[in-house]
Curated annotation (Swiss-Prot):
Function: Plays an important role in growth control. Its major role in stimulating body growth is to stimulate the liver and other tissues to secrete IGF1. It stimulates both the differentiation and proliferation of myoblasts. It also stimulates amino acid uptake and protein synthesis in muscle and other tissues.
GO molecular function: growth factor activity; growth hormone receptor binding; hormone activity; metal ion binding
Family: Belongs to the somatotropin/prolactin family.
UniProt organism field: Ovis aries
Name this polypeptide is given: Somatotropin
Gene assigned in the entry: GH1
Record flagged with keyword Zinc: yes
């Protein structure tokens, strides 16, 4: 039988994941900064896992194993997010301030809002993407959470001009085309990478501020 402590933690995590940011900020204005960070980390972790699972399923279904490595080293695998000075790992992220990491995370999230509106049309028969029509909503929730954290840290007006030089294309619904398959494969790879960065930045900030034992990741 599961102990009361872990069970309570799991229930709290599930509740936070399902709770809209409007409720967090509006109905519970006294919610602690640690609670806002915990909520953001859970949402980013959930989205990153979904992105990773989807990439793996797409790769297994459509991309021959012998071609995967070569494709990942071509232009199709280039991510537009690489045009911004974003840390590439935990050590680099620790050199940035919390507000810098939040601004970068916001840019990464916002770069996907357009393409992900069409995601469910591409993966209508996918088991992993059975909830693909909600990915956009989840991403919007995370965007709101990051903005809430920025407001808490008194950065009311995010810097103008910090935008991606390019943005991501929409996913191609013509899955019978080789070009479309390669395009979608590249987009899913970038989505996975960008969500991994976002999750890493949020976890670095949370651990740095609150020094939790679970900071070794």
């Amino acid at each position: 039988m599961m102990a009361a402590g872990p069970r309570t933690s799991l229930l709290l995590a599930f509740t936070l994941l399902c709770l809209p940011w409007t409720q967090v900020v509006g109905a519970f204005p006294a919610m602690s900064l640690s609670g806002l960070f915990a909520n953001a980390v859970l949402r980013a972790q959930h989205l990153h896992q979904l992105a990773a699972d989807t990439f793996k399923e797409f790769e297994r279904t459509y991309i021959p194993e012998g071609q995967r490595y070569s494709i990942q080293n071509t232009q199709v695998a280039f991510c537009f997010s690489e045009t911004i000075p974003a840390p590439t790992g935990k050590n680099e992220a620790q050199q940035k301030s919390d507000l810098e990491l939040l601004r970068i995370s916001l840019l990464l999230i916002q770069s996907w809002l357009g393409p992900l509106q069409f995601l469910s049309r591409v993966f209508t028969n996918s088991l992993v993407f059975g909830t693909s029509d909600r990915v956009y909503e989840k991403l919007k929730d995370l965007e709101e959470g990051i903005l809430a954290l920025m407001r808490e840290l008194e950065d009311v007006t995010p810097r103008a001009g910090q935008i991606l030089k390019q943005t991501y294309d929409k996913f191609d619904t013509n899955m019978r085309s080789d070009d479309a398959l390669l395009k979608n494969y590249g987009l899913l790879s970038c989505f996975r990478k960008d969500l991994h960065k976002t999750e890493t930045y949020l976890r670095v900030m949370k651990c740095r501020r609150f020094g939790e034992a679970s900071c070794a990741f």
